[in-house]
């Protein structure tokens, strides 16, 4: 019984740290990129025609901190899939492989182009993944 309590306490602590860690990533990336709340809200509403460099760099930061992009702005498909709801993972694998082939010398532009490519086929992702 005591062992179960310790396990539950440890698990609860880990989940709380993960939750706040994700919030810190968003906050840190907003601060680092200087993206406006308005640009983030427009993106969440589906406006992916913005030419906002700060938004693009926010997405790069967000994806790098979550391990989706490496330091060379290359996509780790397996890690990207882990951030999606299970119901979307199978259908997303081919799409991630297609979208990751986008070439761009600027890592911020590349991250934005990959998100745009993905969202064109799965717009519901903007509501499923906590970008804000």
Please report, for each region that a protein language model flagged, where it lies by residue.
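Cleavable N-terminal signal peptides of Sec/SRP-targeted secreted and luminal proteins
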Residues: 3-21
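Secreted, propeptide-processed cysteine-rich mini-domains
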Residues: 22-40
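Disulfide-stabilized extracellular ectodomain repeats and their linkers
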Residues: 26, 58, 66, 77, ...
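Short, recurring structural edge motifs at helix starts
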Residues: 43-50, 99-105
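Amphipathic regulatory helices of Ca2+-sensor modules
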Residues: 75-84
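Compact alpha-helical subdomains of small soluble proteins
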Residues: 83-123
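Short, low-complexity, Pro/Ser/Thr/Gly-rich segments in the mature regions of secreted, periplasmic
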Residues: 124-132
């Amino acid at each position: 019984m005591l062992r179960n309590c310790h396990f539950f306490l440890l698990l609860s602590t880990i989940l709380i740290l993960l939750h706040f860690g994700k919030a810190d990533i968003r906050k840190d990336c907003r601060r680092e990129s200087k993206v406006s709340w308005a640009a983030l809200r427009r993106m969440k509403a589906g406006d992916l025609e913005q030419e906002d460099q700060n938004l693009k760099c926010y997405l790069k930061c967000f994806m790098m901190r979550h391990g989706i992009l490496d330091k060379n702005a290359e996509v780790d498909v397996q890690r990207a899939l882990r951030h999606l709801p299970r119901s979307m993972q199978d259908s997303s694998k081919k799409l991630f492989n297609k979208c990751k082939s986008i070439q761009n010398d600027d890592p911020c532009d590349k991250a934005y182009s990959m998100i745009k490519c993905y969202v064109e086929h799965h717009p519901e992702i903007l509501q499923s993944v906590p970008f804000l």
